[in-house]
């Protein structure tokens, strides 16, 4: 799993400032004592499980491009291998939806020097990309497979009454965590996460920004 503080290799694919931060906390109002996170997480898990069950055959078609700075664009054409994994400890309803962006064409890059080769290779591995290396006396070559492992994790911060949504390699390479007040984890937000995964629709970012602005005014 890549470090949350690793800078993404890709350029920002959205024009939203929220997509350029590694962690964003949306301030919360006082949560009602009777409100619990379990129903919210349960609905999110059911929605993600339904996606995983329906997306297997045939695979979902989606053209995506991951811009690798200094290398080129890694292109994929489908979403495959969806799965839902529950967090084992603590068993608080947290879970992860994992999947893969899959394509057909490898991305080949000849490095200008051994130093560049080593730095690029490390950063590619940090993002869990599948990389083959070919070295000779005169050149070092990176062959990047058209496969990007991605995940969306839903978890809990009970000490602050927050739900956390972590996107890893979704739309762009890198990991970003959104900490949201419990009441923000509603049907619209959950559906927007699914739309972000399956269509790259950016409603999720807009809802997150709207939630932050609403609480600043409140």
Give the residues covered by each predicted segment.
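Alpha-helix boundary/N-cap detector
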Residues: 13-16, 28, 32-35, 39, ...
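Generic N-terminal initiation segments characterized by hydrophobic and/or small/turn-forming residues
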Residues: 6-10, 65, 204, 214
């Amino acid at each position: 799993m890549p470090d949350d503080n690793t800078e993404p290799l890709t350029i920002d694919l959205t024009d939203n400032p929220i997509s350029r931060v590694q962690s964003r906390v949306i301030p919360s109002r006082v949560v009602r004592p009777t409100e619990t996170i379990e129903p919210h997480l349960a609905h999110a898990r059911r929605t993600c499980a339904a996606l995983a069950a329906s997306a297997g055959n045939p695979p979902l078609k989606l053209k995506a491009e991951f811009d690798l700075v200094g290398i080129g664009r890694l292109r994929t054409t489908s979403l495959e291998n969806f799965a839902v994994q529950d967090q084992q400890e603590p068993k608080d309803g947290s879970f992860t939806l994992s999947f893969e962006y899959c394509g057909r064409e490898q991305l080949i890059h000849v490095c200008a020097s051994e130093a560049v080769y080593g730095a690029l290779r490390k950063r590619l591995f940090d993002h869990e990309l599948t990389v083959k290396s070919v070295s000779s006396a005169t050149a070092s070559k990176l062959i990047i497979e058209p496969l990007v492992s991605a995940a969306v994790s839903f978890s809990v911060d009970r000490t602050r009454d927050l739900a956390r949504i972590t996107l890893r390699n979704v739309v762009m390479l890198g990991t970003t965590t959104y900490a949201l007040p419990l009441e923000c984890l509603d049907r619209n937000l959950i559906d927007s996460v699914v739309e972000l995964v399956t269509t790259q629709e950016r409603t999720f970012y807009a809802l997150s920004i709207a939630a932050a602005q609403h609480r600043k005014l409140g």
